[in-house]
Amino acid sequence: MSRELIRTADAWNKVKIARDPNRPNAKFYINEIFDEFIELHGDRNFGDDKAIIGGIALLNNLSFTVVGICKGENTKENIKRNFGMPHPEGYRKALRLMKQAEKFKRPVICFVDTPGAFCGIGAEERGQGQAIAQNLVELMGLKVPLISIVIGEGGSGGALALAVADKVFMLEHSIYSVLSPEGFASILWKDSSRAEEAASVMKITAQDLKSFNIIDKIIKEPRGGAHKNPIKMAQNIKKTILEALGEMKGTDLDTLLNERYNKYRNIENNL
């Protein structure tokens, strides 16, 4: 994608940038940002969803729980990770790890990059809606600092299930919306070919969402996009995480939870 296109990116071009197959995924950022990472598997109920990776990480001698929705770097890995569309067991695995973080008082860092939760019959039979709803409830009251970063696509409830947090950040050319532009166009106009038009009215860019105070900060991408300089992008994210933790350091638990609750209660006042 040309530098000129990046520079003048409108909403639809940002959709294309966010979906770029060369864009760094959650696995890359976890390995690049943290000094050590031990992956943990399974939801202790059905299985291990490869679309969500999570575990315990170290950064500057501090322990974290890290969870990320992960796309693949090639076709084979994309099939393994279901193109970043989690099943309910993925969301339950994520919640299991975050409740473990609460037990051991570890901050939680989430990376979000998904077109949406998987909507296959099996996923619905295993309680996809319930799994997402349970995450929303539990994250709102999780008794540790929570940071969520949208690194590519933030699609619908599948993204929100890992994005109820004290601090929500978006990369400069990422998107976050209730559904895809194609889905919006299909529902509203019965014509998915009008996706570009839909993107322009949906207010899905980081810049739009920051203006509504839905997110807290936009993390600047290297010139040409995150995929042009992944190492630099990881450094920018790392710096932002450490700054956010510094801001929350010393905040008592009641204040942390009240501010998190009010953050979401007040969103309607900004729309």
Swiss-Prot record:
GO terms for cellular component: acetyl-CoA carboxylase complex. Its EC number is 2.1.3.15. It catalyses: N(6)-carboxybiotinyl-L-lysyl-[protein] + acetyl-CoA = N(6)-biotinyl-L-lysyl-[protein] + malonyl-CoA. Pathway: Lipid metabolism; malonyl-CoA biosynthesis; malonyl-CoA from acetyl-CoA: step 1/1. One of its GO terms (molecular function) is carboxyl- or carbamoyltransferase activity. Keywords: ATP-binding, Cytoplasm, Fatty acid biosynthesis, Fatty acid metabolism, Lipid biosynthesis, Lipid metabolism, Nucleotide-binding, Transferase. The keyword Cytoplasm applies. It is found in: Cytoplasm. It is an enzyme of class 2 (transferase). Pfam families: ACCA (PF03255). It comes from the Bacteria. Acetyl-CoA carboxylase is a heterohexamer composed of biotin carboxyl carrier protein (AccB), biotin carboxylase (AccC) and two subunits each of ACCase subunit alpha (AccA) and ACCase subunit beta (AccD). Belongs to the AccA family. Component of the acetyl coenzyme A carboxylase (ACC) complex. First, biotin carboxylase catalyzes the carboxylation of biotin on its carrier protein (BCCP) and then the CO(2) group is transferred by the carboxyltransferase to acetyl-CoA to form malonyl-CoA. This is Acetyl-coenzyme A carboxylase carboxyl transferase subunit alpha. It comes from Clostridium perfringens (strain 13 / Type A).
